[in-house]
Swiss-Prot record:
SUPFAM superfamilies: beta-sandwich domain of Sec23/24 (SSF81995), C-terminal, gelsolin-like domain of Sec23/24 (SSF82754), Helical domain of Sec23/24 (SSF81811), vWA-like (SSF53300), Zn-finger domain of Sec23/24 (SSF82919). GO terms for molecular function: signal sequence binding; SNARE binding; zinc ion binding. Belongs to the SEC23/SEC24 family. SEC24 subfamily. The keyword Protein transport applies. InterPro entries: ADF-H/Gelsolin-like_dom_sf (IPR029006), Gelsolin-like_dom (IPR007123), Gelsolin-like_dom_sf (IPR036180), Sec23/24_helical_dom (IPR006900), Sec23/24_helical_dom_sf (IPR036175), Sec23/24_trunk_dom (IPR006896), Sec23_24_beta_S (IPR012990), SEC23_SEC24_subfamily (IPR050550). This is Protein transport protein SEC24-2. GO terms for cellular component: COPII vesicle coat; endoplasmic reticulum exit site; endoplasmic reticulum membrane; Golgi membrane. The gene is SEC242. It is found in: Cytoplasm; Cytoplasmic vesicle, COPII-coated vesicle membrane; Endoplasmic reticulum membrane; Golgi apparatus membrane. The COPII coat is composed of at least 5 proteins: the SEC23/24 complex, the SEC13/31 complex, and the protein SAR1. Golgi apparatus membrane; Peripheral membrane protein; Cytoplasmic side. Component of the coat protein complex II (COPII) which promotes the formation of transport vesicles from the endoplasmic reticulum (ER). The coat has two main functions, the physical deformation of the endoplasmic reticulum membrane into vesicles and the selection of cargo molecules. The keyword Phosphoprotein does not apply. One of its GO terms (biological process) is intracellular protein transport. Keywords: Cytoplasm, Cytoplasmic vesicle, Endoplasmic reticulum, ER-Golgi transport, Golgi apparatus, Membrane, Metal-binding, Protein transport, Transport, Zinc. It comes from Candida glabrata (strain ATCC 2001 / BCRC 20586 / JCM 3761 / NBRC 0622 / NRRL Y-65 / CBS 138).
């Protein structure tokens, strides 16, 4: 028990949650646990894997392609698997019943993804199907949203060196189906999508948990399909050859595979490509067209009246100044340039520190044909010009403080910046508070009043207004230049047009609506995100290719990159905070027990190194539709549907996007009912689904209420920014963006808000995103991955108000963008601040979530009170995250499920 004493607030303890099951535990499931047998899947059975520390002898290797032999470790594991299977028979554990299973046999949600080690139709361990009734699982068990996907059931004997790292972690690569249909007709019949969710990098900085690196220059690849050697190949002919697991071709084993870097004998089974599915090569010369160029940053800064007036220019200059020492500069070659823009282009000639401290500004007013006055002094080495750069950044706000120009020539500035670094490549960083309104790429304010929330919204408000913003990205891709935008203004910015710059170059668009430097919360968010963005490691001259084994083909690609060919995605620079989705198709029957997918990323680092990152995954195959469903990954499927809906919203209409989401889900449920459910009863029939997919309807329902897709009038900049974010957002943040995580703070457990034994702040268990669980006297934190809302019940007792805010009257609580002030002597205030800080901690994205304090309505608040009217928009925004409810005129989740059931029973 914790030694911390829990403060009990009057009324707040004895009523809360009365009659409501804990989040994630349906009432009907509370005492039911499915059969538990340990799985032979690697990663779930650490104790079954013996140490592997010796090279197999030649007679232990495969003598011929048909006669595969195992290493000693594999033989031992095979024996253990057989023993487990035998024991299961003795324990009378059979395959879980299908839809005849009574409701009381529903497994606990935390067990859905746990394989029971039972043999599937192909006599190999497979995930088993556990049915649930969605309508009896209300509120939905949201704990499932934090569970890993159903495990990849790959027997250890299929790996050269069985280990936890032999198959790719779901952090790097997730497949929507962890049991691959053996033919296209079975995939089509299932109505489930087949796609990969790829996140090549897990952290903003590469030194955090890097994968193993091969530095000897040996890269072993298949002669035919060009896949890389991986833990799932087999050695044949006394180890002299290896059989490719992708195309089955026998390849010669190079002598260097059994030699160290110095040429001494070495154990091939200790090599990284054989032990680890995620690893890197230091690329040899044949993978390098030229010496990796220095990292180059060109800052295109809006210095027009808007940017000066709202403080964006001064905030940006200060942020760059403070972040110069954190710019990636591992090889001491990083270069920087600054281009100020209004109705003219203002270049700065920056001398080396040792030569002079006189910085010259050169104004080019001919924006139609801009030229570089002193090209060699425009882009300067950071190390050698550090003092002069700091001097310029300090003076920049003063130089333009009285600027009254309202024009912003972004198009000409982009062309000039691209011309400056066309030989090097690099990153153009645009910071703007003004709609481009002069020169090439000039944009107009669009009339939203008669178009928003109509079928024309996508074509007239969310489409690219000027072809320049798409065509320019082709030029950028050829010269290895990416574009990132930071748009911060109270005015219309046409995010829909400008976001194309980042979409096709590997960049990103960051949107700060209503920004003003007068609000410290706005400044804090911008500076923290801008600084993390600048300090983030990146890769230049990057290409990524996905390969599938025989029968599998990549068919569509989603994310921020330039698709050069049918399977090659090009990134002028690859950031560390984005993910990608590749759709796959099955072109021919798969005749093997397992299929394979490999992601290869060829890149240049800021260390002047050229590297190849390899991610390989093995997926069991099946001819059973029930096994396909039992191994489906609901979060990866939701991500894929999101990408398809974003595409539909931008190319067709928002209604079509919502229809796509709902129709996709309905087709899956209808197929499950028709093909998997054994017996049906009309009218009172339950809404059956498999446990591992039970959150998919909730996520689809939540996505239809997301700012990106929901019906109603949404400012086009906000909607375009939301669509842009969903395109590239890593999966775990996308899930929170769709279904917000809600914490009840007034009654949290004693340990919450304090550090645990590892120094990590303990968070309360999330509750369902529904106002029905909110008490009028409660305190709640809503986290939607972009913002935080601290909701104070309108009837909160004075003790709670005093402990949290240090105020005596609830009506004194500041509403809107505010940090939670420190209250001296209040332990509860410290705990709440600790929780907010913990929720904001991210080392894999640059997002810093602004906190909005919201006072809920009170029974004592006079009807029509001015304060209540002012708070209404903020309250509506906060409660729009409670997606299980009727928000903004939409169905509640219960009604949504009932509608689905009625459609399926027609």
């Amino acid at each position: 028990m914790s030694h911390h004493k829990k403060r009990v607030y009057p009324q707040a303890q004895f009523q809360y949650g009365a009659g409501v099951p804990p989040a994630g535990i349906p009432v009907s499931d509370a005492s039911i646990i499915p059969p538990q047998v340990q799985s032979p899947q690697v990663g779930a059975t650490d104790n079954m894997i013996p140490p592997y520390n010796q090279t197999p002898t030649m007679n232990q290797m495969e003598q011929a392609p048909q006669a595969q032999m195992f290493t000693p470790a594999q033989q031992q594991l095979n024996q253990q698997i057989n023993s487990v299977t035998t024991n299961m028979g003795a324990m009378n554990i059979g395959t879980p019943m299908m839809e005849q299973m009574p409701q009381q046999m529903t497994p606990q949600p935390q067990m859905y993804g746990q394989s029971q080690g039972l043999m599937g139709h192909s006599n190999k361990p497979m995930n088993q199907l556990y049915p649930v009734d969605l309508l009896t699982e209300l509120p939905p068990p949201i704990h499932d949203l934090m569970l890993p996907p159903p495990p990849l059931m790959v027997s250890p004997d299929k790996m050269l060196v069985p280990s936890e790292t032999a198959n790719a972690s779901s952090d790097y690569l997730r497949c929507t189906l962890n049991a691959m249909p053996k033919n296209g007709s079975l995939l089509k019949k299932s109505k489930l999508p087949l796609a990969l969710v790829i996140r090549p990098y897990q952290h903003l900085h590469d030194e955090v948990n890097p994968p193993p690196l091969n530095e000897d220059g040996l890269v072993v690849r298949c002669r035919r399909c060009r896949s890389y050697m991986n833990p799932f190949v087999t050695f044949i002919e006394q180890g002299r050859r290896w059989r490719c697991n992708f195309c089955r071709l026998a390849n010669d084993v190079p002598m260097q595979l059994d030699q160290s870097f110095e040429g001494a004998p070495a154990n091939r089974y200790e090599r990284n490509e054989i032990k680890h599915s995620v690893m890197e090569y230091l690329a040899p010369k044949e993978y390098t067209v030229r010496q990796p160029p220095p990292s180059t940053y060109i800052f295109v800064l809006d210095v027009s009246q808007n940017a000066v007036k709202n403080g964006l220019l001064a905030t940006t200059a200060r942020s760059i100044l403070d972040t110069l020492e954190f710019l990636p500069n591992h090889d001491n070659r990083t270069r920087v340039s600054i281009l100020a823009v209004d109705n003219s282009l203002h270049y700065f000639s920056i001398p080396l520190d040792e030569e002079s401290d006189q910085i010259r500004m050169m104004d080019i007013s001919d924006i139609d044909e801009p030229f570089l006055p002193k090209p060699h002094s425009m882009i300067v080495p950071l190390n050698e010009c550090r003092n002069n750069l700091e001097k310029l950044l300090t003076q920049l706000p003063e130089i333009f403080q009285f600027n009254i120009m309202s024009k912003f020539a972004l198009g000409p500035a982009l062309k000039a910046a691209q011309n400056m670094i066309s030989n090097l490549g690099g990153k153009i960083v645009v910071v703007s508070a003004t709609l481009p309104n002069i020169g090439i790429g000039k944009l107009q304010r669009r009339n939203e009043s008669g178009v928003a929330n109509t079928p024309k919204e996508s074509t007239q408000l969310l489409s690219c207004q000027d072809a320049f913003y798409k065509n320019f990205t082709i030029t950028c891709s050829k010269s290895q230049v990416s574009v990132d935008l930071f748009l911060a203004s109270e005015d219309y910015m046409d995010v829909a047009s400008l976001s194309n710059l980042g979409r096709f170059t590997g960049g990103q668009t960051h949107f700060y609506p209503g920004f003003t430097a007068a609000n410290i919360a706005d400044v804090t968010k911008f500076t923290k995100e801008f600084s993390k963005f600048l300090s983030m490691d990146l890769s230049t001259e990057t290409v990524m290719r996905a390969r599938g084994s025989t029968g599998i083909r990549m068919s569509a690609f989603y994310g921020h990159f330039f698709n050069r060919s049918s399977d090659l995605c090009a990134f002028s620079t690859m950031p560390r905070d984005q993910s990608y989705v590749f759709e796959m198709s099955i072109d021919e029957n798969i005749g093997t027990e397992y299929c394979y997918v490999q992601i290869a990323v060829l890149l240049s680092l800021n260390t002047s190194q050229r590297r190849i990152r390899i991610i390989t995954v093995a997926i069991p195959t099946t001819e059973s539709l029930s096994e396909v469903y039992a191994s489906a990954d609901q979060l990866a499927i939701a991500d894929f549907f999101t990408k398809k809906a974003v595409e539909k919203a931008m190319n067709s209409s928002l209604q079509d996007a919502r229809d796509l989401l709902n129709k996709s889900l309905q087709d899956i449920l209808a197929t499950y009912k028709k093909e998997i459910v054994v017996s049906n009863t009309a009218g009172g029939a339950p809404l059956r689904f498999c446990a591992n997919l039970r959150m998919l309807p909730l996520l689809v329902h939540a996505l239809s209420k997301h700012t990106a897709f929901r019906a109603g009038i949404v400012p086009s900049d906000h909607r375009a920014a939301a669509l842009n974010n969903l395109e590239s957002m890593p999966l775990k943040y996308l899930v929170k963006s769709a279904y917000a995580r809600v914490y009840s703070l007034h009654d949290m457990v004693d340990e919450a808000g304090y550090p645990d034994e590892n120094g990590e702040i303990v968070l309360p268990e999330p509750i369902n995103a529904s106002a029905s669980l909110f008490e009028r006297y409660g305190l709640y934190l809503i986290d939607n991955s972009s913002e935080l809302f601290l909701w104070v019940g309108g009837d909160a007792v004075p003790e709670l108000v005093n402990d949290v805010f240090g105020l005596q009257d609830i009506f004194q609580i500041p509403n809107g963008k505010h940090e939670l002030a420190i209250v001296e002597g209040s332990e509860f205030n410290e705990r709440v601040r600790n929780i907010i800080q913990k929720v904001r901690e991210h080392d894999d994205v640059i997002t810093y979530q602004t906190l909005y304090i919201v006072r809920g309505p009170s029974v004592s608040e006079p009807v029509g009170h001015a304060a209540g009217r002012e708070l209404q928009p903020l309250r509506m925004w906060a409660t729009s995250n409670l997606v299980e409810d009727k928000v903004l005129g939409t169905e509640s989740y219960r009604e949504f499920l009932q509608t689905l059931k009625n459609k399926l029973n027609k």
